[in-house]
Amino acid sequence: INAFVPHAFDLAAFPDEDCPPHFYAWGNNPQFPFFRQLMDYMNRVSHLIQGGRHIPCVALLYSAEGEWMDRESAQPLEEVCLALNRAQIDYEIIPGDVLVSAPVENRRFRAGEETFGALIVSGRRFMSAQLCAWCQSASAQGVSVLFLGAAPAPVDPAAMEAPHPAPGGTVVSQEALVETLRSLGLSEIRCDAPQPYLRYYHYAQEDGEIILFFNEDPVHAIECRVRTPFGADICWYDPWLNELAAAETEDGGVRLRLSPYQMMILKAGNSGAKRLWQPEKAAPVEPEGGWTLSMIPAGETEPSVRLNLPALTNLCAPDLY
């Protein structure tokens, strides 16, 4: 998503129960002073990921047609998406009516401005004869066509018959999908340890390429070494601080550190990077007697809610309150 329209400004007196949430809330929202920082952050990131081209690894065939033909046996597409997300293999979901006219060249096919070296077809019993014919042709031209579980039977929508031949391609299991794609060279991000909550987005502009890294884990930080297609001439961009920082590389990879829900952008080329990104470290302090959490209700100046915590914890945890 690269375009946002803030809409939660309400001119009615606060609270207007018919129109939550309220960004400003006539001065009653204690987070409103930080709203400008959030909008600046969103503007910077949105600017970087529009007007260019997304660089995915593979394409997934949209599964609606297979589900309409046989809902009981069709594999939910989100199962495939989850497996790819957890392995840092980026993808686009392509509808069948776009795919059947996609040209093939140099062992890749084109859809819009993007090219793909592989098509993944989630588990289904049937597929239209037109799609089967495209898969057979693309496979013969070097595109990796992967069917999960079993190859679907081709069906002619007009005659409701199953003509032959069956679609070309390779049948792989869901469990073997990730390693199959990696063996085919269709994975550009590799971590030194599994990172199921790490997401990335590779994007190209006329003046260079970037990779967005995001930690989807709401609780745990990510710290690992990541291999990217950029090589050693790279730097970090922090969109919240609007700063460039030289990247810390080691053993052919870059050191990545992300707090929960944090995003950092890796930039090809290190022009403008002034300093090495280093986390601030201090001697640990063990407080005596636990922690006191104070909360000030909206519209007041003094805390009226106090909680005694034996240890410092995630203040956003739903079971804390």
Kindly give the residue locations of the regions a language model identified.
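Carbohydrate-binding surfaces of carbohydrate-active enzymes
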Residues: 1-321
